[in-house]
Amino acid sequence: MHPHRDPRGLWLLLPSLSLLLFEVARAGRAVVSCPAACLCASNILSCSKQQLPNVPHSLPSYTALLDLSHNNLSRLRAEWTPTRLTQLHSLLLSHNHLNFISSEAFSPVPNLRYLDLSSNQLRTLDEFLFSDLQVLEVLLLYNNHIMAVDRCAFDDMAQLQKLYLSQNQISRFPLELVKEGAKLPKLTLLDLSSNKLKNLPLPDLQKLPAWIKNGLYLHNNPLNCDCELYQLFSHWQYRQLSSVMDFQEDLYCMNSKKLHNVFNLSFLNCGEYKERAWEAHLGDTLIIKCDTKQQGMTKVWVTPSNERVLDEVTNGTVSVSKDGSLLFQQVQVEDGGVYTCYAMGETFNETLSVELKVHNFTLHGHHDTLNTAYTTLVGCILSVVLVLIYLYLTPCRCWCRGVEKPSSHQGDSLSSSMLSTTPNHDPMAGGDKDDGFDRRVAFLEPAGPGQGQNGKLKPGNTLPVPEATGKGQRRMSDPESVSSVFSDTPIVV
C-alpha cells in the first residue's frame, strides 16, 4: 500500500518555488541582456574600442552609463535603440566617425545629463537637435568640423551648464547662448577656443555678468586687433577671471597677417586700462550689482563710512535688494564714495569695491531733451529749405530785362570815361595840326555833389549838367565802354 500524502504540504512549497524561479529568471535575463561586444558591470555598459559599425541591439533598459567611444559609428538614427533607456544619464560617443545625427535620436534617452560627441566629423548643428535633452547638463562637441550653429540648436536646454565647442571651424559668435536669462540661463562654461572667430560683439560681452565671462574661453582665435578688444580682456584680467588668467599667452589677435598677444598692443597706442567709477546726478535712481564670479553667493554691502547697508531704507537713500544689488533712491552728494561688497559662498569668497561719483546738479528730463532735439531738427530743415530756395528760386534779372532804352544825360555817371579805340596820335608832331585825328581832353568829375578830388567834400560845389550832344557822339559813362578809369589825371582821348 502506498502511504497517504497530505496535499497541504504541497501548497506550502509553492511560494518558495515561485520565488526561486523568479530569481533564476532575473539572473538569466541579466546575463542574456548584456551584448556580446560589451562589458557589463551592474548598470554600466562599456562597448568601446570594438570597431562597431552600429549600436548593439537589446540594450538593458536599466543601463545608466553607455560607453560607445572609439568605434566606427557614422550615423545615429532615430531607431538606434529599440528600447527606451529612461535610466541612462551618461552617453559616450566620442572618437567615432559620426557625420549625421537625427533630430529624434535622443528621444529614447530623455533623462540624459552627460553627452560626449567629441572627436567626430559633425559639420553642422541643426535646429532643435538637442531639444529632447531638457535635463542635459554637460555637452561635449569639441574636435569636430562644425562650421555652422543654428540659432535654435540648443533650444529647450534650460539645465545645460557646460558646453564645449573648441577646435572647430565656427566663425560666428553665438551670442544667443550667453545672454543672461536667454536660452541657457544656467550656462557657466562656454568653450569657443581654437575656432575661426574674427569679430566679437564687444559691447554685448562687456555687459555680461562676471559669472558668465569667467567661463567664456576665447583663446586661440584669429581675432582682429583693436583697442576695444584690449580694453575688454584687460578688464577680465583685472577681475582675475579664469578664462583669461589660465590662457594669457594663448590670447592673441591678428594685425597685418601677424599674430600679437592681446595684452601687448603697444603699436596701436591703446590707453592703459583703468576701472571706471559709477556716476550719478542728484535725484537719480541707481542700481549697482555685486558682480561676482559665481552665482548664489551671500552678499553684504559696506558704505564708505564702514557701515553695513541694510535690506531696507532706514536713514538715507541706500538699501540692498533681494538679489544682493545696491539700490539708491534719490541720490545725494553725500552718497558718493567707495562701497565694498563681501560675497560668501560654500567654496569661494570674493570682495569687490565700486566707486560712486555724484555730480552736484540734476540732469534735464527726457521731455527737455526731446524738445531740444526737435528744435534742432526743425532748424536744420528750415536752413536746408532756405538754401534750396536761394540756389534754385532766386529771380534772374536777365529773364525779365527788356530792351535797354537810352537814358538821359542826367543819369550818367560822371566818375568814369571811355578810352577811345581811335589810333594813337603822334606825340612828336608839331604845330596845331591834328593829322586827321580829333584830340580831346576829358577830366573826371566828382562822383556826386559836394565832393572834390579823392572823394573829399567841398561845400558849395555843384556839378554842371552837360548839354545834350549829337546823337552819334558816345557818352562819357556809357555802360558799354571798354574800360573806366577812376583818376583825377586828365586823359587824352
From Swiss-Prot:
Q: Where is this region: Disordered?
A: 405-493
Q: Name one GO molecular function term.
A: potassium channel regulator activity
Residue pairs linked by disulfide bridges in the UniProt entry: C34-C40, C38-C47, C225-C253, C227-C270, C290-C341
The entry's family comment says: Belongs to the immunoglobulin superfamily. AMIGO family.
Superkingdom assignment: Eukaryota
Species of origin reads Homo sapiens
Which parts of the sequence carry Phosphoserine? S477, S481
Its taxonomic placement starts with:
Eukaryota, Metazoa, Chordata, Craniata, Vertebrata
Residue span, Ig-like C2-type domain? 269-353
The protein depicted here goes by the name: Amphoterin-induced protein 1
UniProt GO BP: axonal fasciculation; axonogenesis; brain development; cellular response to L-glutamate; heterophilic cell-cell adhesion via plasma membrane cell adhesion molecules; homophilic cell adhesion via plasma membrane adhesion molecules; myelination; positive regulation of axonogenesis
**What function does this protein fulfil?**
Promotes growth and fasciculation of neurites from cultured hippocampal neurons. May be involved in fasciculation as well as myelination of developing neural axons. May have a role in regeneration as well as neural plasticity in the adult nervous system. May mediate homophilic as well as heterophilic cell-cell interaction and contribute to signal transduction through its intracellular domain. Assembled with KCNB1 modulates the gating characteristics of the delayed rectifier voltage-dependent potassium channel KCNB1.
The record, for InterPro entries, names: AMIGO, Cys-rich_flank_reg_C, Ig-like_dom, Ig-like_dom_sf, Ig-like_fold, Ig_I-set, Ig_sub, Leu-rich_rpt
Q: Which residues form the LRRCT domain?
A: 221-272
Which Pfam families is this protein grouped with?
I-set (PF07679), LRR_1 (PF00560), LRR_8 (PF13855)
Q: Where are the LRR repeats?
A: 62-83, 87-108, 111-132, 135-156, 159-179, 186-206
User: What Gene Ontology terms describe where this protein resides (cellular component)?
Assistant: dendrite; membrane; neuronal cell body membrane; pericellular basket; perikaryon; voltage-gated potassium channel complex
Q: Where does the protein end up?
A: Cell membrane; Perikaryon; Cell projection, Dendrite; Cell projection, Axon
